[in-house]
Every structure is written in structure tokens, then in C-alpha cells.
């Protein structure tokens, strides 16, 4: 019976009886994500593309490992007994002070409000990167490589979550089990947008079996595919919500981010002809006039000022709440 190898960067299935000291090629280090660059602590290679990161060949050989890494242990919280709680109660007379009434929530504005383009703030790093691209664009046109359909033995599949490598013509007929979505890292949790099996352990995330079946993608063909997915994340403070879109070398003159109090439309052109589009029905209400966009060489940050200082349960309004808001609007 074939077992799954849990060594980082391997993910292959192996026969325990034929497992040898050099059967596995893996990474002994840990994944490193810094300034949109992804790599392994044991290797010097870095990339901005998550699929390329997953396909980085291991730098160490050893035996396959079938032992699944343990999930991080959560500390056990013990409650004291009722008897102890009674003893902890103060013996003096308590004076209860009533808290002030909470501020009434702002009524949700209509989604049909006119959209406004948010202010774009362009960083010096992006300006320098775009200037370099303009200088080298003329030379690159003369140095374009001719399309070559030949696939080299050992080429990794570019589909997310697939660890298969090209072994010959028979690999063209194999069924690829992969993740059709994009990886999401939020508040310590890691998961794919297509199946949302969340985990806090990176090795378990890499070992998650795909949720979609199709053909292997041995080469990336961006030609003719303008609209592409981008890894994006969000976080919040008491007064602001920030969305980070990891798109490199975005073009300010072709990009736009527009919003009203409850809707956000994002259109970003980056790396030449790639486009990213996202429309979000916001969970809360924002102050459009005090919201803005910061564009850097490695990402775009959309900073939205909250209309009221409250914690958002999520970035996007759930489908059930959307229907309730629509019903309220029709009855009014």
C-alpha cells in the first residue's frame, strides 16, 4: 500500500518496502514569506509566484517520511471549581455602575449610491520599478524566446496543490488532482479559496489533496489570458479595514479602485497585460472621502476608513444578510 510522504516539498506516495536513503528529495528548512517573496530557509531561491514556490525542487535527499506532523497543541484552559469561585468573591458590598448606552448603529446606506474613485498614492519604489521596465522594454522585444512545446523530464505541474513531475508521454494522459482556487493566509490560518479546509500548520496545508480533477499544466501560457487571480488578504484595526492585493509592478494609469459606502470595485493592471478584478459587498459601512489606495512595487493596499468604530465579522457581507438587506429595502 502506497503511503504519503510528509517531508516538506515532496508530497509523493511511496512503497515502504522500496524506501531507500536517497528516495526522497525534500526541503529540511521552513517556508519563508517576506516582502511578497517566497522560498525555503534551506535554499537561496526566491519567487513571487505561489505555484512556482510549490514546485521548487528539494535541496536534500533522504528517506520518505510517512509520519504526519502533529497539529500545534492548544493550551488547555482549566476552570476553577464552584467552591473556589465562591471563595474568590469579594466580601465587601458591591456597587454596580451602569454603563452608558451604546451608540446606535448607523443605518446601512443603499448600494445604489454613486461610486467614487479612491485617491491613488504611488510609492517611490513603484515609480523606480516602472522606469526600469520602460528602459528595458525595447531590448526585451528583440530578445523574446520562441515558443517551444517540448517539456523537459522532471518539470513540475504548475497547478496548485499538484506535486507530480513530467516523466514522459504517459504523463500527458494522467489525471491531475489540484486546487483551482488561490492560497489564502489570514490570521494564522492557511487554506485554498476553492475548498476552505483551514489549518494552522504549513506542512498540512501543502499536503492537502486537490478538490478538482483535470489535466496537468506543464507550462504556463499567459498569452490570451488577461484576467488572472491574485493572492489577497485583509486585516482591520478599530477605525480602518485594509485589503492587500499582491500584484507586482501595477500600472497606476490603467488601474482604478472605486467605492461607495457599502461597495468596493477593484481593477488592477500589472506586469504588462495581467488584470485583476474584484467586486466586494462590504460587511460594514465606510467613509469614502477618508479612504485611499497605496500602490507599491510588490502590492496594492486599499485602506478604508470605517464609518463607525466597530469590529467587522468578515470583509464581505454574507449572502443571507444580503438577501435580508434587499428585503428591508423593498419594504421601505
Swiss-Prot record:
Name of one Pfam family that matches: CS
Gene, per the UniProt record: CHORDC1
Annotated stretches, region: Interaction with HSP90AA1 and HSP90AB1: 65-316
PROSITE patterns: CHORD, CS
Keyword flag Phosphoprotein: yes
Domain CHORD: 5-64, 157-216
Residue segments, region Interaction with PPP5C: 2-77
Phosphothreonine PTM sites in chain numbering: 47
Residues engaged in binding Zn(2+) 3: 157, 162, 176, 216
Residues that hold Zn(2+) 2 according to the record: 27, 42-43, 59
Modified residues (Phosphoserine): 51
Superkingdom: Eukaryota
Designated name of the protein: Cysteine and histidine-rich domain-containing protein 1
Modified residues (N-acetylalanine): 2
Domain spans labelled CS: 227-316
UniProt GO MF annotations: ADP binding; ATP binding; Hsp90 protein binding; zinc ion binding
InterPro entries, alphabetized: CHORD_dom, CHRD1, CS_dom, HSP20-like_chaperone
Binding site residues for Zn(2+) 1: 5, 10, 24, 64
Species name: Homo sapiens
